[in-house]
């Protein structure tokens, strides 16, 4: 059953967003400021009704600032999916010489880590082949998590594609009349290109085994 009272929706949504952004619930004062309520008793009343409806859970064993969390029913009332998202694995990318790499169809799926949930729907993964990024801990056989974007700042680690549809993972630099894709391996030379397409920025790493 959806929440009917608009202020309750606002209170619930603010608590949920504060937990996502900060890792803990807001104070009563912060809730009031966010939803336009000055009476702490009114805010407590909304919270108690949300608890009774099963949308909030109060844990008496925790300090007051950590005592409230949004339940699955509360998330559903807000229209937030409670089904864990998955990142598609779209083939492989080299940490070496560029190769044909990115596929349109996913070969497998990987659960989204909690700290990357905000990027759900905007990520893909690639299997790494090669050793050109070993100085920053990207090893042959790793999977990189990539946030889809078509631009990058100097120094970002990106998945980039050249005019021959060859993709590679490198550190990106925009210079006077060219782009430099810099490996993180002292034994390898940079790739210099006149044109480059950014497929995304590397924001995470997964490794199947401990080396």
Swiss-Prot record:
E.C. no: 3.4.21.88
Feature: DNA-binding region: 28-48
CDD domains, per database record: S24_LexA-like (cd06529)
Domain of life: Bacteria
GO biological process terms, semicolon-separated: DNA repair; DNA replication; negative regulation of DNA-templated transcription; proteolysis; SOS response
Record site: Cleavage: 95-96
Keywords annotated in UniProt: Autocatalytic cleavage, DNA damage, DNA repair, DNA replication, DNA-binding, Hydrolase, Repressor, SOS response, Transcription, Transcription regulation
Catalytic activity from the UniProt record: Hydrolysis of Ala-|-Gly bond in repressor LexA
Enzyme class at the top of the EC tree: hydrolase
Record-linked InterPro entries: LexA, LexA-like, LexA/Signal_pep-like_sf, LexA_DNA-bd_dom, LexA_repressor, Peptidase_S24_LexA, Peptidase_S24_S26A/B/C, WH-like_DNA-bd_sf
Active site residues according to the UniProt entry: 132, 170
Entry-linked SUPFAM superfamilies: LexA/Signal peptidase, Winged helix' DNA-binding domain
A GO MF term: serine-type endopeptidase activity
PANTHER family named among the record's database cross-references: LEXA REPRESSOR, LEXA REPRESSOR-RELATED
Quaternary structure note: Homodimer.
NCBIfam families named in the record: lexA
Function: Represses a number of genes involved in the response to DNA damage (SOS response), including recA and lexA. In the presence of single-stranded DNA, RecA interacts with LexA causing an autocatalytic cleavage which disrupts the DNA-binding part of LexA, leading to derepression of the SOS regulon and eventually DNA repair.
Family (UniProt): Belongs to the peptidase S24 family.
UniProt protein name: LexA repressor
Lineage of source species: Bacteria, Bacillati, Bacillota, Bacilli, Lactobacillales
């Amino acid at each position: 059953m959806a929440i009917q009272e608009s202020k309750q929706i606002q209170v619930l949504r603010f608590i949920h967003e504060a937990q996502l952004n900060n890792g803990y619930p807001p104070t009563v004062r912060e809730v009031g400021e966010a939803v336009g309520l000055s009476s702490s008793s009114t805010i407590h009343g909304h919270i108690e009704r949300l608890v009774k409806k099963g949308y909030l859970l109060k844990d008496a064993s925790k300090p007051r600032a950590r005592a409230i969390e949004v339940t699955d029913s509360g998330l559903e009332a807000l229209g937030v999916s409670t089904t864990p998202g998955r990142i598609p694995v779209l083939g492989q990318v080299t940490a070496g010489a560029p190769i044909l790499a990115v596929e349109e169809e996913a070969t497998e799926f990987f659960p989204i880590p909690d700290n990357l949930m905000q990027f759900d729907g905007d990520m893909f993964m690639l299997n790494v082949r090669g050793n050109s990024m070993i100085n920053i801990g990207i090893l042959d056989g790793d999977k990189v998590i990539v946030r889809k974007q078509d631009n990058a700042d100097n120094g970002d680690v990106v998945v980039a594609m050249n005019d021959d549809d060859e993709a590679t993972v490198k550190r990106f630099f925009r210079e006077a009349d060219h782009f430099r894709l810099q490996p993180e391996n002292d034994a390898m030379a940079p790739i210099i290109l006149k044109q480059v397409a950014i497929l995304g920025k590397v924001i995470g790493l997964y490794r199947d085994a401990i080396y």
